[in-house]
Design a protein with these regions (language model features):
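A structural signal for small-residue-enriched, beta-sheet-centric alpha/beta enzyme cores
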Residues: 160, 164, 207-212
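Residue-level signature of catalytic and energy-coupling elements of molecular machines
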Residues: 11, 74, 127, 204
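Interdomain regulatory linker/hinge segments that flank or connect interaction modules
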Residues: 10-18
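Long, charge-patterned amphipathic alpha-helical coiled-coil/hairpin "stalk" segments used as oligomerization
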Residues: 83-187
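Flexible glycine-/small-residue-rich
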Residues: 66, 167-169, 206-208, 216
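Intrinsically disordered, compositionally biased charged tails
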Residues: 1-6, 216
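Flexible, glycine/charged-enriched surface loops at secondary-structure junctions
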Residues: 22-27, 191-202
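Translation machinery proteins
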Residues: 18-72, 93-97
Length: 216
């Protein structure tokens, strides 16, 4: 790993010292500035989900579209909502409620048999936001899939050579934050044309606090 753990620990310590107390739990965000990448080439743009070692927040909101046994098993977990076919049809006729659901939900999972209906009813809202559901077979281990999605973050590089994503919260142990940050670095190394050489700089910050540079 090109980035030493000590450098990440140092930056985390600095932002926690600099950050003022707020009346809410601040997130910790990683900001990467890239270089020498031609974003006019579609293959160089990034829009994907990265699985972190630890959930970056406690309240990841997951909505599941399912019927039958899959819906029953989903309701036994701590997902945000479980909606069936009738609810989907109702949402299709109410754009206001559809937009509210999409804005309130971090990730969507959907039984494979409902994907076509979802595409017709919610696709125009989900698609532009990058929130199209992950298809789930009716017999899939929904609990395992939900646990995995609670650890996911979306990273995007589209029009500018910079990306920002949440890697945890200010009350997380430093060691957990370090592991999550390293997971992002590892994925970008794999994904960028020249690997780590395409990363110009890295910073971390809390939601409302100043940033601190990670020495690369």
């Amino acid at each position: 790993m090109p980035v030493k753990k000590e450098a990440i620990f140092k930056a985390i310590s600095e932002i926690k010292q600099k950050s003022k107390k707020r009346n809410f739990k601040q997130s910790v965000e990683l900001i990467l500035t890239l270089r020498d990448i031609n974003l006019k080439k579609p293959e160089n743009r990034i829009n994907e989900l990265v699985e972190l070692p630890y959930a970056p927040v406690e309240d990841v909101r997951i909505t599941v579209f399912a019927t039958g046994d899959l819906a029953l098993r989903a309701r036994d977990t701590d997902v945000y909502k479980v909606l069936g076919r009738d609810a989907l049809i109702t949402l299709a006729n109410n754009k206001k409620n559809s937009k509210r659901l999409v804005n309130e939900t971090d990730f969507f999972l959907a039984e494979t048999t409902l994907m076509a209906l979802i595409g017709r009813s919610l696709g125009p809202i989900l698609g532009p936001r990058g929130k199209m559901p992950t298809p789930i077979p009716p017999t899939a281990p929904i609990e395992t899939i939900i646990n995995r999605h609670q650890k996911l973050v979306r990273v995007k590089v589209r029009n500018q050579l910079v990306t920002q994503c949440r890697v945890g919260t200010e009350d997380m142990a430093d060691a957990l934050l370090v592991d999550n940050i390293q997971a992002i670095f590892t994925r970008f190394e794999q994904r960028l044309p020249k690997g780590f050489k395409n990363i110009r700089s890295a910073y971390i910050k809390t939601s409302m606090g100043p940033s601190s540079k990670i020495e690369l």
